[in-house]
Amino acid sequence: MTYCIGIKTKDGIVVASDSRTNAGLDNVNIYSKMFTYDVGDRTVLIVTSGNLGTSQAVYKTIEKDLEDKSGKKNLNTCEDFDQVAKYIGALNLKHSSPKGMNTDTVLLGSTFIVGGQIKGKPMELFLIYPQGNYIKPADSKPYLVIGEVKYGKPILDRVITPDVTIGDASRCALISMDSTLKSDLTVGPPIDFVVYKKDGYKILSQKCLNI
């Protein structure tokens, strides 16, 4: 299991994810579930929960598409974040449903939180489902969580509002993550933690925390 958080404030975006994967108590590993793309006129932050193989396949395809010079669709060619969400959603659906595999009996789906900003466009935050469709958070509760959400969500419900500052959102995200770490053994450190400031077009702070 995993736990990932994305919070959109009036000042910026906060994203956090744990790094634990497990297939039973005797098979625990550490894998980063965060991808950051920070260059030129755009910053894209991605965290994921679900099938690790699918998530890594999506990340690898994103990187390969960025290196492709043939004009293929990639994060650089997306004109706004709706296009970013559609692009990642299409990759997610493709890798979640490989040809010839019975997806009724094999769980291959991954869920993504994608946030950031393209120059001249507003900041955005999306949740992308295994089927490729996506949603935005409610204006009244501008955050998204995926994975093992039940322990860390109550503090977010109490603190995160449209007027929350990026500092308070950062502290709230860390408390939410710590609550989950203490309550669920399938979620564990290190914690990848990123802060993006509005109209900065680069990551303000990126840390790997052993909390």
List PLM regions with ranges:
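N-terminal nucleophile
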Residues: M1-I211
